[in-house]
Amino acid sequence: MSIALKQVFNKDKTFRPKRKFEPGTQRFELHKRAQASLNSGVDLKAAVQLPSGEDQNDWVAVHVVDFFNRINLIYGTICEFCTERTCPVMSGGPKYEYRWQDDLKYKKPTALPAPQYMNLLMDWIEVQINNEEIFPTCVGVPFPKNFLQICKKILCRLFRVFVHVYIHHFDRVIVMGAEAHVNTCYKHFYYFVTEMNLIDRKELEPLKEMTSRMCH
């Protein structure tokens, strides 16, 4: 990553502190392995495959946290251009509108401006990944039985951030010289969720054409 790009993707651009794994734990080692997959020249399609002998839930957990951090960072770089005026509804072009529901304040799917949707989304994901009953940090503590279902919901909603950024704000990404970095993050995400079967194909439709060109 160039110095200029590092300045674009700095920690001050994120909405919230990054969730990290404790050094010396198995998940920290898996996290480092997942991080290394973004090094230049790495075969991303191969890098996302579950390592031999490793637990699927551990592998998914470190990637969900990692993708949350990265996608939060990507949105943070363009959030000043994503306003209630420019994006009055959270959408991915004219065909796709995303409504928010959390069974708390928003018990029914509700149309919201994109920045409000994004803030609710990031807050909601942060609550999930900081919940020890869902993402246990202590070695030996089991994941809940519905862990993969929760992760599927998180990843499905994170994909919508990519959809919105690519369709409505990619001109800003290009101006910042961050196109290659965002594309690599997207490819990593796409290969992972399809390899692990974590997102329904119909949810991937908004970026299908771009994905077919980018992810062979």
Curated annotation (Swiss-Prot):
Residues binding Zn(2+): C82, C87, H164, H169
UniProt cross-references to InterPro entries, sorted A to Z: MOB_kinase_act_fam, MOB_kinase_act_sf
GO BP terms, alphabetized: regulation of hippo signaling; signal transduction
Gene Ontology cellular component list: cytoplasm; nucleus
Coiled-coil zones: none
GO molecular function: metal ion binding; protein kinase activator activity
UniProt-listed Pfam families: Mob1_phocein
Keywords: Metal-binding, Zinc
Parts of the chain that traverse the membrane: none
Hydrolase among keywords: no
Induction: Expression at transcriptional level is activated by the expression of the neighboring long non-coding RNA (lncRNA) EMICERI.
Family: Belongs to the MOB1/phocein family.
General function of this protein: Modulates LATS1 expression in the Hippo signaling pathway which plays a pivotal role in organ size control and tumor suppression by restricting proliferation and promoting apoptosis.
The protein, known as: MOB kinase activator 3B
Species for this entry: Homo sapiens
